[in-house]
Amino acid sequence: MEVLMTNESKAPAAGGAPKKLSARGLVKRFDGKEVLHALDFDVLDGEFLSILGPSGCGKTTTLRILIGLLMPDEGTLTLGGRDITTAPPDDRGMGIVFQNYALFENMTVRGNAEYALKFKPELKARRREIAQGVLEQLGLAEHLDKSVRQLSGGQQQRVSIARTLALNPEVILFDEPMSALDVETRLSLRLELKRIQREFGTTMVYITHDQEEAFALSDRVMVMGEGSIHQLAAPDEIIANPADDYVADFVVKNLRIKMDSLARFMDR
């Protein structure tokens, strides 16, 4: 089954990969208070980048600026060299997967995957084919005509991911998509996301407060605290050389605790 996405010689990002998404000097203020402090970062083509931090660190505000739900007070965003700073969400070349699935409960699995394609008239003739293709790739072939209410939480999240993939976005943003799922389902979905990234070279930006999840999934991790970037590096580099005491305490120490807990779960 042919789908819209292709994997033409794309591979997960390496150190020499070109920049896909660039932020320069991003500042955001609410009621006069600055909550993002001149953020500078790049997301490389085909990489999996996690933005990691506790509640209130600015990661969700950053996500909302990336997708276009908020405008920065200062700074610029470019995607593939195109300035998207003030572009509306549907003209940014990005897709988003939410924590709460955001599915239409009165529709079937297939209907949910097809829904976003209804706003792409040039794809009208292939809408059903594209939706079915991505659903099959995510292991949902047996559930196409079921109501999404009949699915488990993990299956519903797969439908949400399939709906985003069907649009073939240049970048997929994930807003803590696994926080409501049990441990086994989360582990399974991690494998799915890494497979998608590997097979299609999809650029992914993943928002999370979970250290173990970020380090298991990511090519690089951007550690945020109080509206600033404390470190942006590969997981091994952060563990070996935390940039400051904040990174050492929030990431490294907590990661070791979580890894010990996961090991005990896997040994059951």
Go through the PLM ranges and name each one.
Residues 147-151, 155:
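Conserved ABC ATPase signature
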Residues 67:
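Helix-to-loop junction immediately C-terminal to a conserved catalytic motif
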Residues 166-170:
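A short, proline-enriched helix->beta-strand linker immediately N-terminal to the Walker B motif
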Residues 83, 125-143, 194-195:
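Conserved ABC ATPase "signature" region
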Residues 226-227:
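Conserved ABC ATPase "signature" C-loop
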Residues 52-54:
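The feature captures the beta-strand-to-loop junction immediately N-terminal to the Walker
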Residues 232-233, 241:
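ABC ATPase "signature
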